[in-house]
Structure formats: structure tokens, C-alpha cells
Design a protein with these regions (language model features):
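Active-site catalytic microenvironments in core metabolic enzymes, especially phosphate/sugar-handling
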Residues: 1-203
Length: 203
């Protein structure tokens, strides 16, 4: 079985051919009787998922859900406080260290970092929610220029730590949880974590 965060297919398909890498990959799995499970949004939203792991990695305390799901206690993004306020430069260095990134992109709104909103993957659409939650800084990925401009001039520091960089911390946690569940269920199975290559990186 292959467990992934991102699905290979996002849009519905009517047939599968070998004309695209996505279809070829899934056909290879089918031919070799390999099941594929892609968690994606459910893992983003659930308590203990992508955003909780990201918030914990950064060191946020007293975290709350940034964008609550309808009818549930979970949802997208988290917002919490640092143990001690710091400058954006200091916080940026912290982000690079804990997420193991060589580079990040930051927009400086001139505020010290104390209350931080995070959304793993692509969460730039939630700038208004971050501001409404009282955050002074927002960490996410896939930030466009005009989105960053809106954040900075609205008084919100913004950090693009890349889509991949903000989600990768979840992988080892997920593998450990699956291994524990298998062991407690009496299954003799090995959980292997694939070496992740960075799709986009500074050269």
C-alpha cells in the first residue's frame, strides 16, 4: 500500500491511458496490486494533522483553529503564540531551521512576531482570517505577489516557507502513527518513508 498526502489525480477522469505521468503511475500501481490512499484535505483539517504538526514544530502555544470546519472542531490552519516575541528576521531564521529550508520569502509589515497563524500547503487565501484572529505573522506557501502586498499593507508579516516545506513535517509523524496502529492491531508490517525530493528550490 502507498500512502501519500497529495493525490496524483485532482480532477475526475473518465479513462486512464499511458499518455500522462499521472496515469502511468496509477496504472503501474494497479498492475502491481498496490493500493493508493491520498489523505490531502482531511489530513490538513483534522486535529493532530498537518497544521497542528506545523504549529508544534514552530513552537506555537495555545493554538486554535484558524478556519473552523462547518459542524466540527477541526478545520484549516492554526493560530497560536510564541513563548517570547522576536523580530521577523529572528523568526525567519527559526522557520528555516525547524523546517530544514535553505531559503524562504518574507514580507515585512514592521511588526514583531508574537502571535502567528500557519496554514500548511497553500493558505494565502486566509490572510483575512489571520488578521481577524489577531495574528501579526502568517506562515504558509504558494504566496503570490499581490497577496503578499495585501498582507504587508494590512499590517501582517507574511512568510512563504513553500508548499512542500510546510507539509513535510507531517510525513514522519504520519508514518509513526501508522506503524503504531499496525503494531497495536497485531499486524506484522513495515512502514517505510520515501525520500522526498524538493520539487521547487532555489539554485
Amino acid at each position: 500500500m502507498l500512502v501519500t498526502h497529495h493525490p496524483v489525480i485532482f480532477d475526475p477522469i473518465k479513462k486512464m491511458t499511458d499518455r500522462s505521468w499521472q496515469h502511468k503511475l496509477l496504472l503501474d500501481c494497479a498492475e502491481n496490486k498496490i493500493a493508493v490512499y491520498s489523505a490531502h484535505t482531511s489530513l490538513d483539517s483534522v486535529l493532530g494533522g498537518v497544521n497542528d504538526v506545523l504549529a508544534e514544530k514552530i513552537g506555537l502555544l495555545l493554538t486554535e483553529v484558524l478556519v473552523p470546519a462547518a459542524g466540527g472542531e477541526a478545520g484549516l490552519g492554526r493560530v497560536g503564540c510564541l513563548h517570547e516575541p522576536m523580530t521577523l528576521q529572528e523568526f525567519s531564521e527559526k522557520i528555516k531551521t525547524v523546517l530544514k529550508l535553505d531559503n524562504i520569502i518574507a514580507g515585512d509589515a514592521g511588526r514583531r512576531v508574537s502571535k502567528v497563524a500557519v496554514c500548511g500547503g497553500a493558505g494565502a487565501e486566509f490572510i483575512d482570517e489571520a488578521l481577524a484572529a489577531g495574528a501579526d505573522t502568517f506562515v504558509t506557501g504558494d504566496v503570490k505577489y499581490h497577496t503578499a502586498q495585501n498582507a504587508v499593507y494590512s499590517g501582517l508579516n507574511i512568510i512563504d516557507a513553500t508548499h512542500q516545506g510546510t507539509e513535510l513535517p507531517m510525513i514522519n509523524t504520519l508514518a509513526d502513527r501508522i506503524a503504531l496502529r499496525l503494531t497495536s492491531g497485531g499486524f506484522n508490517a513495515q512502514v517505510l518513508v520515501a525520500k522526498e525530493s524538493k520539487i521547487l528550490q532555489c539554485l
